[in-house]
């Protein structure tokens, strides 16, 4: 008999179950044959601390140190670039402000990502503090913690 049942074996469910397992008996129910089968296993696995709604940004900031340091860290530097067409200027400006992105020239954007066609975008921005998350290792560590 479990004290708590967590439904879903993706990153959110496994994370919650791992934390709860420190104090309770926890069972994770997953419909698929493997954990992380859907979005958690197929995502771009990007950690950008300032991305999302205010509630998401708060969670990102609260978890940043854990992702950097726990079990040797789960983050690898990648950087984040955004590009936008002229008609998306307002949304681009909002992202620059809320995410702390530095505006860069189209030439610099193409230098960083040579496949970009400068005729297809008007604005570009770059932020070094974007990271890849090793989601597989993170989920496996959560599973070990749950057991």
Where are these regions (language model features)?
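Helical element adjacent to the flavin cofactor pocket in flavoenzyme catalytic cores
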Residues: 126-147
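Short beta-to-alpha linker loops that shape the active-site pocket of alpha/beta-hydrolase fold enzymes
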Residues: 32-34, 109, 142
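Gly/Ala-rich phosphate-binding loop of Rossmann-like dinucleotide-binding domains
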Residues: 17, 21, 145
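Beta1/beta-strand and adjacent pyrophosphate-binding region of the FAD-binding site
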Residues: 1-12, 27
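Dinucleotide-binding Rossmann-like beta1-alpha1 core, especially the glycine-rich loop
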Residues: 44-115, 121-123
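Long, amphipathic coiled-coil "stalk"/hairpin helices in large membrane-associated assemblies
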Residues: 13-18, 31
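Short beta-strand/turn micro-motifs composed of small residues
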Residues: 8, 30, 84
């Amino acid at each position: 008999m479990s004290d708590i049942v967590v439904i879903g074996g993706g990153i959110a469910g496994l994370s919650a179950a791992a934390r709860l397992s420190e104090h309770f008996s926890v069972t994770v129910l997953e419909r698929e044959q493997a954990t992380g089968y859907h979005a958690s296993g197929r995502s771009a696995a990007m950690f950008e601390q300032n991305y999302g709604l205010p509630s998401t940004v708060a969670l990102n900031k609260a978890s940043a140190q854990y992702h950097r340091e726990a079990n040797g860290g789960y983050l690898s530097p990648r950087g984040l670039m955004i590009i936008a067409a002229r008609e998306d200027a307002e949304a681009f400006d909002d992202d620059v402000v809320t995410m702390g992105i530095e505006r860069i020239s189209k030439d610099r954007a193409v230098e960083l990502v040579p496949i970009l066609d400068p005729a297809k975008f008007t604005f570009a921005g770059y932020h070094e503090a974007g990271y890849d998350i090793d989601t597989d290792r993170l989920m496996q560590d959560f599973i070990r913690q749950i057991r």
